[in-house]
Amino acid sequence: MRGDTKPEVCVIGLGYIGLPTAAIIARAGCPVHGVDVTQTVVDTINRGEIHIEEVDLDGLVQAVVQRGLLKASTEIAPADVFVIAVPTPFAKDGNHTPDTSYVMAAAEKVAEVLKKGDTVILESTSPVGTTEAMRDAIAAK
């Protein structure tokens, strides 16, 4: 990021948390690259439409897509700021243990394009220690 330019933001996970976050950041004038593993979600967003129920989000997404500030893809792209907003469902162990595998997979993908000075934000609901584990996974790359 240079001087007075807006940071480029990459939001990983375009569901109930990620898509509104991406749209609001884009409304502020930052170019946003949204990432989702589901191609139909990507295609829907790139048409300026939404795949979730959220009051007034449809108009906001349409506006920022039309302005060229929000683009979606299935691949992570270099950015100045990364927001990880992927699911953390319960594992199928019967103990309600959070499954952080989506977070760790996203962190490993971010590590592939991360450069000095970038910021990584974990927005996903996660148990204590997940941020440190994510940091360690990124540092190991």
Predicted regions and their residues:
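Conserved N-terminal Rossmann-fold NAD(P) cofactor-binding segment
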Residues: 2-8, 31, 37-81, 85-98, ...
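Glycine-rich Rossmann-fold phosphate-binding loop(s) that bind the pyrophosphate
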Residues: 14-15
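N-terminal Rossmann-fold NAD(P) dinucleotide-binding loop
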Residues: 18-19
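Gly/Ala-rich phosphate-binding loop of Rossmann-like dinucleotide-binding domains
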Residues: 22, 26-27
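Rossmann-like NAD(P)(H) cofactor-binding subdomain of soluble oxidoreductases
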Residues: 90-141
